[in-house]
Amino acid sequence: MESRFVHACALNLLLIGTFLFPSRPLSGQDETPPQTFDWFLENGVPSQTTWGQLVDTAYTREILSWTTMPEYTNAVVDHLPAHPTVVSPRDHFGYAIGKPGVLHHVDEIYGYFRALSGSTDRVRFQLLGETEEGRNLALVQVGSEANLARLEEVRAGLNSLADPRATSEAEAARIIRDIPPIYALYGGLHSTETGSPEMLMEMAYRLAVSDAPMIREIRENAVVFMVPVAEPDGRDRTVDWHARYNADTYDMDDQVRGPPYWGKYIFHDNNRDGLQLSARLTQELVKLFLEWKFPVGHDLHESVPYLYVSTGTGPYNPTVDPITISEWQWMSNFEVTSLTAHGMPGVWTHGFYSGWYPGYLLWVTNTRNAVGRFYETFGNSFPNTVERTLEGRSTSVEWYRPSPPRDTTLWSLRNNTNYMQPGALTSVFLVAQNRSMILENFWKKSKNSLNKGKTEAPFAYVIPADQERKYNVAAMVNLLQRQGIEMHRAADDGVFDSVEVSEGDFILRMDQPYRNYALTLMRRQDFPADAPTPYDDVAWTYPLHFNVEAFAVEDSIIQSELEVQPITSMVSIPGEVEGGSGDVYLVKPNAAANLLTARLALGDVPVSAVEGEVEVDEDITLDPGAWVLQTEDSREVENWAREHGFTVFRVRNRVLDGAVTHELDLPKIALLHTWTRTQDEGWARFTLDQQGVEYDYIGEDRIGHMGFLKDRYDVLLFPHQGARNTARRIFQGLDPDDGPLAYTRTPEYPTHGFPDSSSNMVGGMGYEGLVAIRDFVNEGGTFIAVGSASTLPLEFGMLRDVSIQAAESTFIPGSILKGEVARRDHPLAYGYGESLPLYHQYGPYLSVSEEEDDGIAIAYTSEGELVLSGLARGGESLKGEPAVYSEQVGQGFIVIYGFDALHRHQNLGNHALIWNAILNWNDLGAGEGGNK
């Protein structure tokens, strides 16, 4: 194996005499730092490879002249083979990949792949689905002519290996013997990590034309899939941004930060969407995997120097098959060893990322019995060559980084390609050489997961269909299906392990290939208290996030004795109208995630809320918050109840005798955003749009210059501003010294100015903005501040009796905690039971004086276990403290949340805490304990 790899080396331009000396710029070059280099000239550019293939000398000269030091390339990528008919990037663009100052838009990248695929039968190109803004993702397939011609056979074989129930041992052995594995590479997911879409164009050409033994091995024994730009909207936005602001930037300190938006909604969290599948790009990439079932997926990112190959520090997610964990180590060690042997410093593994959270793009494969991997390659984001100075922590010698990066170096876009491409080729080469083992492991892991579902508890989850929050139940069941997990409905009643099953209940049987993934989604997470700081959330338990019931069954007999029917389409659970006569309809409060949609669907029907309990009959008493519908159109109400999953009681007027009600009049809403962080407000916009809510979207730079806000709006929603953010940072915004900084659409930069625009994003909201918010509330508006956004009204004194606790010893890194309803008649608590799960990450931790505790709607549980899933180190200090609070200020209200109730569109069970604030915006003082 080693000799075949060594023979793949092409030109070996890393000569001893130049290996450690600084690079020299080409003579006459004025830029500082230099953009081109001549270290290679004394050795010349060979015209052919050691295996006799002609070299594209013009392309190769550009590769080398844009590489800052000889140690930053190797014999795999220090040249490019020539071909008389296959279109190279230089043939298409007029220059090689990695040219200083050049990044390509999506259409240009796709244009090249179309040209490449049109010139060789070893490359195919096709468009995938569209993003929210109408740009397509794309798929590039590279392999031998024979392998590409039988892709349908390969797809069928991989799908058979993924389901051992339908494939015998003998059939699996035949498939493993006959088909190549598919290795999938994703580029450009994080838009300001700009190198991978460039690199993949050259890599595809090299795979198509090179006769190097290494490349021939890959072509014959593997098929490479590439998604060159996983986030097309953000790619174009970023390319425009760097052309607009960084074209003449040659110092990292002078770099203008990237665009405020990537996709329409989602920023960096597009790599945290694997659990909820909200973004179109995530949906497309999951769909791609479920269609092809490729055994290896590899996500290309950029950050730390020079090339980090993922394994992670642990603790690893306990549902990952040990084979997969071993494959992580095996592959990464091979890549680190190979590139280090080529003399390339700074290639390492282990000490970055944990391996616990399953919502990353690479975990689309890890959670489904395949291998998920990622790179972090050193990158500048903008395409100019600049000097980079590294911290000591990045340059220390460690067991996992025996050859560290330099303290200071010149770094170029071409260097980025020179590291990323040979790493990826080395990994695909390893898979091709070990084709049978990769496929056999894929089969074994699928079989292991299936067998665990048959032999280890839980053997099933029962999700009752008849729950209060029918919409939430259906949403969870549908999301499980979209994840590729098989769902059933009970065809009969029964009792299994003390769990009652009714006909029509949803059954998640664990005897299926994705049992391990189903388990990690459904069960409690217990993150070790002594583990290093996790890379992301440590809890995501579906039933808790959706605030629905699901019961684990510990007895395997349910798999053999309960008759079930497979679910083959998305489900809905209809509501119903009970009672035969009456003039009034009472809607049972349920705090469902579609509460706002349901209210909007009623249109002009008068709707009010009962502020106390209401007795329907001697057996049924509704909690505070029941809706009263005044209409004579019974069919309209029945259709509405069925569609939205609500239980409605038809009663006579006398049922409401003595009841206190208030109107649920729909407010005019504005969503306030900052220019420093659009990530969390993007999730809020997504959620509002899913609810069909109309709202105005206003930036911090405008809010103080719009006149009286109350003349325009009733509700001002200010979403979470990121973990541990402060009022000072929120208020100050972007540094004025960096301005003026426009984000506006122009003919030169057509992707800018959306979803919002600004002629100057710096300077924050200013005192004018604070005064505008204060006046808005005093004049009768409701200001809703979520998560860290609540620090703004708190630290600037808009609320006198509420403060933020210092919580140095409290560590809650994205967990699900137990909340309790402090006042059942508080409008913010309408529809919730005595307790509810609350997503929480790093505060803020609220404290309310005893004189104002009537404003507490939800508190963290005061007794028993606080943590429902995850970890809360030092969480005892949070017990009994407020989580959701409202207070009347002037004629209006301020509502604050000590957590993000709209987190990544995951915690749907918390959404009604926001919807209740919107629907009851001018009656938040209602109830016996209120200040109405």
Please place each PLM-identified region on the residue numbering.
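Aromatic (phenylalanine/tyrosine) cluster motif
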Residues: F5, F19-F21, F37
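Carboxylate/His-rich catalytic cores and anion/metal-binding grooves
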Residues: A204-A208, N221-R244
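Bacterial N-terminal signal peptides
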Residues: C9-P22
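N-terminal secretory signal peptides that target proteins for export/translocation
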Residues: M1-H7
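Active-site-proximal cap/loop segments of hydrolase catalytic domains
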Residues: R235-G263, F267-N270, R280-Q283, K287, ...
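Short, solvent-exposed turn/loop segments enriched in Gly/Ser/Thr/Pro and often Arg
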Residues: V227-E231, H242, L300-L307, A789
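Intrinsic-disorder/low-complexity accessory segments
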Residues: Q29-V223, I266, R272, S278-R280, ...
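Signal peptide processing junction and immediate N-terminal pro/mature segment
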Residues: L20-E31
